[in-house]
Regions:
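Ligand-binding pockets and gating/stacking loops
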Residues: 1-163
Length: 163
């Protein structure tokens, strides 16, 4: 699975992988926040969480026996990615970064999303897609893009420089 940072989305999208199959579907992260339920509750210890995941894996193996492998593999891949992200929830909290680093990316949503994408890539996520809306301006392209470019230029340049 890969990660998509897309406004107004969240959860696992198995259909996004097309002919590759649901195992390679995207984990959708919307509005720069973790998908609901991804973070381990404070009252659940890491050991108890690991035991719970081991039990889930056992149930998954039993469930998968005799069923179509694509869907069960997709669920298993989504849970594995979620387990890895649970260990790295701090990646999504850009508020704790130095102000100078945040300022390089700007204070708007696209800047935050690109900063999160950079942090995910640095943490080992192999593919991150960031979506930005409003570029399909049709009639007034030059003026429309003139207002969009500053929001894109600054964070994209910072991300390229950092990578």
């Amino acid at each position: 699975p890969y990660v998509v940072v897309k406004p107004m989305s969240g959860g696992f999208n198995a259909a996004d992988a097309g002919f590759l199959g649901p195992k390679y579907g995207a984990l959708m992260i919307g509005d720069g926040k973790l998908p609901p339920g991804l973070a381990r509750p404070d009252d659940l210890s890491a050991a108890d969480d690991a035991d719970r995941n081991d039990l889930r894996k056992l149930a998954d193996r039993r469930y998968a026996a005799g069923r179509r492998p694509g869907n069960t593999e997709a669920n298993a891949a989504a849970f594995e990615m979620a387990a890895q992200l649970q260990k790295n929830v701090a990646l999504f909290d850009v508020s704790k970064l130095p102000p100078a680093e945040r300022d390089r990316y700007g204070t708007h949503d696209l800047g935050r999303d690109l900063l999160i994408a950079r942090r995910l890539l640095e943490a080992g996520v192999t593919f991150v897609k960031v979506t930005s809306y409003g570029w399909d301006t049709h009639g007034d392209n030059f003026n429309g893009h003139a207002s969009l470019m500053p929001k894109f230029d600054r964070p994209f340049a910072a991300m390229i420089q950092d990578l």
